[in-house]
Amino acid sequence: MKVDGGLGLSPNIEKIAKEARSQEERGYDGIWTAETSHDPFLPLTIAAEHTQNLELGTSIAVAFARNPMVLANIGWDLQALSKGRFNLGLGSQIKPHITKRFSMEWSKPAARMREMVSAMRAIWNTWMTGEKLEFRGDFYTHTLMTPFFTPDKGDLGDFGAPKVYLAGVGELMTQVAGEVCDGFIAHGFTTEKYLREVTLPNLAIGREKAGK
């Protein structure tokens, strides 16, 4: 069993390096950040520079406040900096926050999330293989990638692209996690009964759709 720690909901930037080192020295396997009153990625950049073995992840970053290209860049750079230790944990948030706080569109969140993750993986594939970027969906279209904007595929070494985790509560979003993601993040209020009767069966449905 792995035991992970965290940097809290509002980490003090000046103390992140010390706290990350401390958690690694105490034997934690990973350290995670949340997107609340601060950016979730900056603390992990600092933690990556001051640790050697801790897995690093967001739990969660708000997916719909960004687009696939932005997330692909962030994920790529943190994976490179951490030498393969980064896990990109995403969540949808709820409609009022997306439309009123972030001023972004909200529609069909499960379908949009599936497409967002698929688009992000298509971008990573282009950067790693040199294949033409040709992603066309209902919500996102990415068809332009020139050498000037392409990261060096050697950045990631043998690590490959980051793992993608998805938070969910409802049945459809949970199915998306099973279908297109590498892991699932349960809500803190989720009960054992709900996990057993709703979450696990819907993860299985998603995995079956993907032939996993």
Predicted segments, located by residue:
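Structural motif corresponding to the early beta-alpha repeats
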Residues: 58-70, 74
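Short gly/pro/ser/thr-enriched loop/turn and capping motifs at secondary-structure boundaries
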Residues: 39, 63-67, 96, 192-194
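Hydrophobic faces of well-ordered beta-strands that scaffold small-molecule active sites
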Residues: 3-7, 31-33, 56-59, 86-90, ...
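Internal, glycine-rich beta/alpha segment that forms the wall or movable "lid"
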Residues: 72-183, 190-211
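N-terminal beta1-alpha1-beta2 module of alpha/beta enzyme domains
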Residues: 1-58, 64, 162
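Glycine-enriched alpha-helix->loop->beta-strand junction motifs that scaffold or abut catalytic
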Residues: 27-29, 50-54, 82, 176-185
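An acidic- and aromatic-residue-enriched active-site/binding cleft used to recognize and process polar
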Residues: 36, 61, 93, 189
